[in-house]
């Protein structure tokens, strides 16, 4: 390489540093060797360097977005064992992965006994949304209610609801696994009401909708919740066995292995209301 060539190369290096393109800088020498060997021309080399840099930036973006979404454990649809859950319509799940339900601000309900893959599917769909550049927030129902209760005590409830309403997709995991604290149903109602027809949700539960009155400790609040959550909804029911128990099935008693069907009742025909003396916009605990 001539002196002029070395000078130009150093100028390119400085430019890549100034533009904060570390991957392109890292690949520069190897790319130049490919040009010298006649493997690629200048245009192809430029395309290769830019693609390498873009790939790195996209990887970093996704990693940061997953952390912001609280998706610390990444699951994918590719790793989901559809063969183990024959009751599950794979085509329907893959259609959800196109994320049109997010654009339509719909609620996706994943219902089934424990261990049937509800959280895996919810996480995988959330990961797809992150990759597509959509904002996501993932939490269990217990975590959401605890955060809302804390915000209420600190006089920050409106701000917390506004924060949880910003995400294009809110995933609420494990509805029905833990008892809802007193007043928690009303707090969750306020969040659902704020997101209604504005933001999409994925909700997982091991309890049928008919049991939500028991889950939330108030059938009236449960009806108001279901009124909104079933208005624009997709309901996926999994009637299979537990992934976590399949390798130890012989150790589990038959009455534990048997699954309980979770059949959703028809959606409420009229809009539900919170308890007497409570406004629709600001239920009290």
Regions inferred by a protein language model and the residue ranges of each:
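Charged, compositionally biased N-terminal leader segments and the immediate start
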Residues: 1-25
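Short hinge/gating elements
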Residues: 11-14, 30-34, 79, 107-111, ...
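Interdomain "pre-motor" coupling segment immediately N-terminal to P-loop NTPase/helicase cores
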Residues: 17, 21-73
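Generic structural signal for secondary-structure transition and capping sites
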Residues: 21-24, 55, 101, 169, ...
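Clamp-loader machinery-focused feature within the broader ASCE/P-loop NTPase space
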Residues: 56, 61-95, 103
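Conserved P-loop
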Residues: 88-166, 215
